[in-house]
């Protein structure tokens, strides 16, 4: 199990990923695109980094929006893995 980050550490790190929001013990990012095809194309870009890190986001896809939620489920909150994945995903945008 990966170690949970302290609240102070979370608050410091969230400032480094300004396009993400902190919601309880999760990170949330909403990507708005032109249409459903672009939404699915964006989701497909997430597959390789998620598989490589063995850290998979929760996803919600609507017509022109992809909502991404990151948390380390087996740890019950936010860990280093979540912030690394958030930075990776932000780089794909």
From Swiss-Prot:
Enzyme Commission number(s): 4.2.1.96
Keyword Transcription regulation: no
Any one biological process term the GO annotation gives: tetrahydrobiopterin biosynthetic process
Pfam families the record matches: Pterin_4a
Domain of life the protein comes from: Bacteria
InterPro entries cross-referenced by the UniProt entry: PCD_sf, Pterin_deHydtase
GO terms assigned for molecular function: 4-alpha-hydroxytetrahydrobiopterin dehydratase activity
Gene3D superfamilies: Transcriptional coactivator/pterin dehydratase (3.30.1360.20)
Listed CDD domains: PCD_DCoH
Keyword annotations: Lyase
Chemical reaction(s) catalysed: (4aS,6R)-4a-hydroxy-L-erythro-5,6,7,8-tetrahydrobiopterin = (6R)-L-erythro-6,7-dihydrobiopterin + H2O
Keyword Lyase found: yes
Protein family: Belongs to the pterin-4-alpha-carbinolamine dehydratase family.
NCBIfam families: PRK00823.1-2 (NF002017)
UniProt-recorded name of the protein: Putative pterin-4-alpha-carbinolamine dehydratase
Originating species: Trichodesmium erythraeum (strain IMS101)
């Amino acid at each position: 199990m990966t170690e949970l980050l302290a609240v102070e550490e979370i608050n410091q790190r969230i400032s480094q990923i300004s396009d993400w929001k902190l919601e309880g013990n999760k990170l949330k990012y909403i990507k708005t695109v032109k249409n459903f095809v672009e939404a699915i194309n964006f989701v497909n870009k997430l597959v390789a980094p998620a598989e490589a890190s063995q850290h998979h986001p929760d996803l919600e896809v609507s017509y022109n929006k992809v909502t991404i939620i990151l948390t380390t489920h087996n740890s019950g909150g936010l860990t280093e893995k979540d912030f690394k994945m958030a930075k990776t995903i932000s780089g794909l945008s």
